[in-house]
Amino acid sequence: MKALIILGLVLLSVTVQGKIFERCELARTLKKLGLDGYKGVSLANWVCLAKWESGYNTDATNYNPGDESTDYGIFQINSRYWCNNGKTPGAVNACHISCNALLQNNIADAVACAKRVVSDPQGIRAWVAWKKHCQNRDVSQYVEGCGV
């Protein structure tokens, strides 16, 4: 009985955790959701961005004490400008979405919000990790062997 309870707790903890995509799985998913070439940004750049922002983890969060905002999900979308977490002072919520929706294993909402972010004048440069790790680099390795 004790072993059954422990097993149940382990399974419960597994179901609560976010999904960590495999590189090619993410590339195929992003392509299916229309990110390949969206606003001139290649699929390889999107996969590179997700690698360095979240490690392909849908459940990633990062609190920013300076402005009391939090970054959410696979693309680390910020609560100051793009989503509503009910905590960030002066939040804009330009994606008209709950920040928790960006933590789902189904990344359709995160992709829709990323499309909104990249549509702003800053484009993909809105993501610091992209500028640091992907910009002006050969990012083809991020989709290599994925058949996309």
Swiss-Prot record:
Q: Which residues are connected by disulfide bridges in this protein?
A: 24-146, 48-134, 83-99, 95-113
Q: Which gene encodes it?
A: LYZ
Pfam families associated with the record: Lys
Which residues constitute the catalytic centre? 53, 71
Name-wise, this protein is Lysozyme C
| C-type lysozyme domain sequence ranges | 19-148
Q: Does the keyword Metal-binding apply?
A: no
Signal peptide feature range: 1-18
The biological process GO terms on file are: defense response to Gram-negative bacterium; defense response to Gram-positive bacterium; killing of cells of another organism
Quaternary context = Monomer.
Q: What does this protein do?
A: Lysozymes have primarily a bacteriolytic function; those in tissues and body fluids are associated with the monocyte-macrophage system and enhance the activity of immunoagents.
